[in-house]
Amino acid sequence: MLKFTEEHEWLNIEGDVATVGITAHAAGQLGDLVFVELPEVGASFSKGDDAATVESVKAASEVYCPLDGEITEINEAITADPELVNSDPMGAGWFFKLKLKNVADADGLLDESGYKELIG
């Protein structure tokens, strides 16, 4: 199940685990990424918490945790090569996997058409 946030994160939910990243729109707005800081595996976050940081040639920005949960995996490849987030934001450029506290909370997020409407 693919969901989006108003803060430009995407989630691909399989069972009770969500793979999280930033959208192509967000990556495009930021420009070429030069640095990514990811959370620690095992860290717990609440919806809206700062979970990761990205820095581009234009700006630094936070990546927010889209739902309550615990980090189960991080994508080390994007810390070594932040450009993966620009070139494949919804594929190889994912940030972390989150074991969701309550999968039903995802119902409050945007679907793809709702997100497209948000970004115009």
Curated annotation (Swiss-Prot):
InterPro entries: 2-oxoA_DH_lipoyl-BS, Biotin_lipoyl, GCV_H, GCV_H/Fam206, GCV_H_sub, Single_hybrid_motif. One of its GO terms (cellular component) is cytoplasm. Coiled coil: none annotated. Binds 1 lipoyl cofactor covalently. Residues 17-99 form the Lipoyl-binding domain. One of its GO terms (biological process) is glycine decarboxylation via glycine cleavage system. The keyword Transport does not apply. Keywords: Lipoyl. The modification N6-lipoyllysine is found at residue 58. It comes from the Bacteria. The glycine cleavage system is composed of four proteins: P, T, L and H. The glycine cleavage system catalyzes the degradation of glycine. The H protein shuttles the methylamine group of glycine from the P protein to the T protein. Belongs to the GcvH family. HAMAP family: GcvH. This is Glycine cleavage system H protein. The gene is gcvH.
